[in-house]
Structures are given as structure tokens and as C-alpha cells.
Amino acid sequence: MTALYPWLMPIYHQIAQTFDEGLGHHAVLIKADSGLGVESLFNALAQKIMCVAQGDKPCGQCHSCHLMQAHSHPDYHELSPINGKDIGVDQVRDINEMVAQHAQQNGNKVVYVQGAERLTEAAANALLKTLEEPRPNTYFLLQADSSASLLATIYSRCQVWNLSVPNEEIAFEWLKSKSAVENQEILTALAMNLGRPLLALETLQEGFIEQRKNFLRQFWVFYRRRSPLELLPLFDKERYVQQVDWILAFLSDCLKHKLEIDSHRQVADLGRGIEQFSDEQTALGLLQAIKIMQKVRSDLLTINGVNVELMLLDGLTRLVTEVFETQ
């Protein structure tokens, strides 16, 4: 079976038990944040469902297990966004035709829908028709972002599971086994990534804590000098969205400090800077700053063909004119 992270074992066993008891649902929807390794959970569930032994875990010995291990099982299918964009209706129709046929291995059929929130309306409706009339021994495993919205009719046809971030102790111990850093650095990485262990591990491995600290120091210089053109060259072409996220986390923590909210702080290691910046802003000003940078982030992810530097410059200029100079 695909190796599972420790925080995924409980939900795996819960879902697996429903199949062991003959109560496995034909459409299982799992909503989860990125950075939790949920793909391995879906792989493990698919392997279990396809295994002819039908034990708590896939046996790893039957022909079906061997096909799954070789990624060549003819009755296992995947649906995912094309080029990271949408899942189109033609993709769903092709899958519908495949699952309508008899299983080539005379066992179960599984369809893994990765990024179900990316289904176009036509694709969602085409999938709905299949979910409304489930075929024997055919199972759909749907993955969606925790904040995503899907058609209510698709929800109603699925058994829905919500996967939350693991408790800090589990995440901390796992990270400690994977990295040779100080405990406080692990806690900082977890806070930066809202408790998501895989993103925290990447943060530790890539040195993002120090990079973020240096970048936010330059953001402070930009704030003092009101100089967008000084900060603009410091955005990395490979991770400008991540750098926008660092600014958003800083602004969000400033607003929380202003409102005396202590939970879910992402930049707790920069406490003095948070206090000073928030003391110089109004709550409404901080909220407006967050809205501006959220729009920048959204535009960077969704608008093609527009110069990235222009979008960043527009956002930074708006921070100056609509927030900093109005305080």
C-alpha cells in the first residue's frame, strides 16, 4: 500500500472500514487543504478498493495490486485539470463511457477526480448523471480544496469527508524526524504554513524562514519610503505568489494584533515588527491593504497575458495611495 503520513491514517481506516463492512459509498468526496499529502490517501484507497483480497489494506500480491503498483490497471482512471486549468465536459464523457463498460479485470472500477472544484458546469452536470445512477462495482473518489464550492447536487450524491490539519504535536514530531533543525524553527515553519506539515518541511528545506524575514524587512523599507519601484525588483519570478502570501500573512497578523486576536498567527516570530506596524495603522486601513493584496494574488493566478510586474506595481502603488498615505 502507498505509504501514508501519520495524520492520514485515521481517516484512511475510517473510510476503509465502510468498505470492509460492505457499506462503501459509490462516491467519496474528501475536502482538504494543500500540503497534507492527500494524494497518497487517494492512492491508498484506490489500491484497497481494487485489491481482490478485500482486506483492511491491499494485499500487494494479487494481479490487481501488481497492476496498480505498475500504474497500468485498465479499470483505474484519473480525471484532472488540463494544464492546471479546468476539467472539461469531454474528459468526463470519456470517463463515463469507460465506466459504462464491463471491467476488464472482472473486479471493481475506480475513478479518481483530482481537483473536483475545477469541473466546468457542463462537466459537473455530466458527472452528476453518472453519480445519480451508480453502476455496480464502480467507485468515484473525488478530491477538492477545503474552501472549494461544488454543485449542491454533487454534494448530495457523495459521502463527504473533511480532512483538517493535524494537531501540532503530530506535525511537530513528524517534522522533527525529517529535519535536523531547532524546535523553534519547526514551530515557526508550521505557523508560517498554518499547520500543514509538507509545506512546513519545504519551508525548512528551502530556507524560506530567513528568505521571508529578509523580504519583509524590505517591505518595511518600502512602507517607510513609499517606494514601490524599490520593492518591485525583489520579487522572484519563480515565487512571486509566495512572496505576496508573505505580505498577506504579515498584514493579517497586524490586523489580528490590532483586534487582539491571538489564534492562527503566521508571523509570530516577527512580533516587534507586527506591533509597530499595526500601531501605525487603523483596522480599516489594514483590512483595505489585505483586500488589495488578495486581488493582486488572485490576478496573478488567473489572468494570463498581462505583465506580472505591472500587476505587482499596481498593487504596491495602491497600498501607498489608498492605505499608507491616508493614515
Curated annotation (Swiss-Prot):
Database matches in Gene3D superfamilies: 1.20.272.10, P-loop containing nucleotide triphosphate hydrolases
One BP annotation, GO: DNA-templated DNA replication
Any one cellular-component term (Gene Ontology): DNA polymerase III complex
Catalytic activities: DNA(n) + a 2'-deoxyribonucleoside 5'-triphosphate = DNA(n+1) + diphosphate
InterPro entries per UniProt: DNA_pol3_clamp-load_cplx_C, DNA_pol_HolB, DNA_pol_III_delta_C, DNA_Rep/Repair_Clamp_Loader, P-loop_NTPase
Subunit-structure text: DNA polymerase III contains a core (composed of alpha, epsilon and theta chains) that associates with a tau subunit. This core dimerizes to form the POLIII' complex. PolIII' associates with the gamma complex (composed of gamma, delta, delta', psi and chi chains) and with the beta chain to form the complete DNA polymerase III complex.
Function, as annotated: DNA polymerase III is a complex, multichain enzyme responsible for most of the replicative synthesis in bacteria. This DNA polymerase also exhibits 3' to 5' exonuclease activity.
Name of this chain's protein: DNA polymerase III subunit delta'
Organism: Haemophilus influenzae (strain ATCC 51907 / DSM 11121 / KW20 / Rd)
